[in-house]
Each structure stands twice: as C-alpha cells, then as structure tokens.
C-alpha cells in the first residue's frame, strides 16, 4: 500500500524569462507553479506514493490553475482552502555563463499568509498519514501561518505520525530573533530536522 505523505506550505506563481534573457530584456514570461512543500508532494507522487498538499489559494482562476498544476503530478489537493486576495509570485531570471540567476519575490498579502486554523481539519487531513513535512518558510510568512504550522505539527505528533521540517531560513521574510523564537517552539514537535550549518545556527542557535 502506498505511503501517505502530507505537506503544508505555500505554492507560488513563477514567471521566468525565456531564453536566458534578463528582466530588462524580456517582454514575455514563462508561467509555472512551485514551492518547496508543493514540490515535495509532487516528488512523492512521482515515486508512486500518496502526496497530499495543504495550503490556501485565492478563489479565482489563478488559484485554480495552481491546483490544476499539482493535479497533473497526481497530488491530492482536496484539502486546499480557497480564499484571500492573491497568490504569491516570484520572478526568475535564469543565469547564463558567469551571470548568476536572479529572483524577485512579490508575495505580500498572499492567501496563505492570511490563513485561519479553522479552515483546516487536521484530524481528517492526517488520517492514515505516515509522514508530515513542512519548511521554515511557511511560519515565516505571518503569525497566522506560524500558528497553522504549529497546529499541524501538534496534530501529527498526537497521531504518532513522523514529522519533518526543512529549516530553509529566508532573511527577507523574518529576522534571526523571530526565527529562533518560532522555530525553537515548532521543532519540539519535529522528528527529522533538515538544514545546513548556517540555517541551524540562524534559526535554532546551534553551532
């Protein structure tokens, strides 16, 4: 029987320049969707397991397009909440030769940042789950998103489900002090913590 892995996080609209063009050269963008936790759910499905993704997207065609993108990979999207104002966007300029890639984020006011715990029934979402995964990006989005992450981790631990988190510190989203305050609490409910030495130091104070 396939294993069930539940992931929680943000899915974003990615607009990338074609043919290695710079932002200032491009007059069109290629469109796709992605996010750390969403990508994990898709990868799980590619391995023949059950990947379930939990998030909140706007109740409009862009939100539906993001859901349709996930479904193409076989991701279970039935627990995605609808509402809020918008989907977060990031712009990608793919590097060439010695020129590095550049990313510009436009995610303020995204639906997942204005989420409410009452929109999700984690007892139902986690039923039959073998693993729960999230990242440090999700709680960094807002206090509401951090509370949702905590609720999910607590529910998973109460059910005896293995939990994991990728620290993935982003200084543009929150300060080192805020990250340590929130992540130290979240990691009390985490079995597997993923991160490099720098992220462990920044978010947990481990050297």
Regions found by a protein language model. Give the residues of each.
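Conserved beta-alpha-beta core of the PfkB/ribokinase-like small-molecule kinase fold
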Residues: 137-207
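Short, contiguous strand/loop micro-motifs
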Residues: 26-28, 53-54, 107-109, 139-140, ...
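Glycine-rich phosphate/adenosyl-contacting loop at the front of the ribokinase-like
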Residues: 1-76, 116
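Glycine-rich beta-alpha junction loops
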Residues: 11, 84, 109, 169-171, ...
